[in-house]
Amino acid sequence: MSTLVESPVPSNDSQAAAPAAYDPTQKQKSQAKTARIPIKVVAAEKLKKPEWIRVRAAAPGSRFYDIKRILREHNLHTVCEEASCPNIGECFGKGTATFMIMGDKCTRRCPFCDVGHGRPDPLDTQEPENLARTIAALKLSYVVITSVDRDDLRDGGAAHFVECIAKVREYSPDTRIEVLVPDFRGRLDRALHILNSGPPDVMNHNLETVPRLYKQARPGSDYAHSLKLLAEFKKLHPEVPTKSGLMLGLGETDEEILQVMRDMREHNVDMLTIGQYLQPSEHHLPVLRYVHPDTFAMFEREAYAMGFTHAAVGAMVRSSYHADQQAHAAGVN
């Protein structure tokens, strides 16, 4: 495990141990990424994974390698690969993936996330076409499109999302599209205006954790702003289900999670996902607890009691894991 401490101001004596010169054009992963955030990860005792944490490998004869080949041929990224999702074997094996647009370099440095940080490359104008062709070739009936944060773009990438949605609908008119968007912080009004021209079938934005832990887990993000994004989109598109997700194990309490769920419902969020945080590497935020299945079951009961139309809750649940089944259960056909 690891602990978190505020970064001290380096003294002359510590300059020899300073990290290597930062090259913003290179994708920073793991230690290189987390070395330059205000909260540092310090190695400590590691919690043993309980028996209910089980990752499914790709089955023999599955489409795992076929999917990887197709993605590389079309110059596409998936959050499954970039974020080291534990469910990648199962999802790729079944021929599903969550597509990550606008490159593989994020402008944020969230220390729970394994997506690389760096100065993003210019947008690929061929990406919407490549994405649409790939989805059509795979004959997918439901897709999730997400992205890195693009704080370098005036609209946060909203127009690129709309272009991708339009192209997918052109090639696959019966395919349902869920988007998992960044927070568009500082660009919310512009982004929402752009999304009006081509809204998705499901609008997803993850709160990730409780507000008390935002400084450690989501530097550069704001809890109230993320709730506002979901609420404002819902006002503009009341017919489109909204969705958000949380990860457990960063030091939150059960009551804090329940309060976030109440906040979601007060902001008209329809669908919920809750899963166990798993540390991508020793340089990321530590797992401070492994949540028992009985506790996940309690959160699921409470979610339906609060009025969520669908709640996917469990240790291995991720925001886009079985997203098609989640959406179908919530009435998206």
From Swiss-Prot:
Query: Which locations, inside or outside the cell, does it occupy?
Result: Cytoplasm
Domain Radical SAM core: start-end pairs: 91-309
Cofactors needed by this protein, per the record, are: [4Fe-4S] cluster
The record's section on InterPro entries has: Aldolase_TIM, Elp3/MiaA/NifB-like_rSAM, LIAS_N, Lipoyl_synth, rSAM
In which pathway is this protein known to take part? Protein modification; protein lipoylation via endogenous pathway; protein N(6)-(lipoyl)lysine from octanoyl-[acyl-carrier-protein]: step 2/2
Cofactor comment: Binds 2 [4Fe-4S] clusters per subunit. One cluster is coordinated with 3 cysteines and an exchangeable S-adenosyl-L-methionine.
Q: Which Pfam families match?
A: LIAS_N, Radical_SAM
MF terms from GO for this chain are: 4 iron, 4 sulfur cluster binding; lipoate synthase activity; metal ion binding
Q: Which UniProt keywords apply?
A: 4Fe-4S, Cytoplasm, Iron, Iron-sulfur, Metal-binding, S-adenosyl-L-methionine, Transferase
**Annotated region Disordered: where?**
1-34
- Source taxon at top rank: Bacteria
Q: Polar residues: which segments have biased composition?
A: 1-15
Residue sites binding [4Fe-4S] cluster 2 per the record = 106, 110, 113
For whether the record's keyword set contains Cytoplasm, the answer is yes
EC no. given is 2.8.1.8
Reaction catalysed? Answer: [[Fe-S] cluster scaffold protein carrying a second [4Fe-4S](2+) cluster] + N(6)-octanoyl-L-lysyl-[protein] + 2 oxidized [2Fe-2S]-[ferredoxin] + 2 S-adenosyl-L-methionine + 4 H(+) = [[Fe-S] cluster scaffold protein] + N(6)-[(R)-dihydrolipoyl]-L-lysyl-[protein] + 4 Fe(3+) + 2 hydrogen sulfide + 2 5'-deoxyadenosine + 2 L-methionine + 2 reduced [2Fe-2S]-[ferredoxin]
Return the broad EC class.
transferase
Kindly provide the name given to this protein in its UniProt entry: Lipoyl synthase
Please tell me the species this chain comes from. Answer: Bordetella pertussis (strain Tohama I / ATCC BAA-589 / NCTC 13251)
Q: What is the lineage of its organism?
A: Bacteria, Pseudomonadati, Pseudomonadota, Betaproteobacteria, Burkholderiales
Name the gene that codes for it: lipA
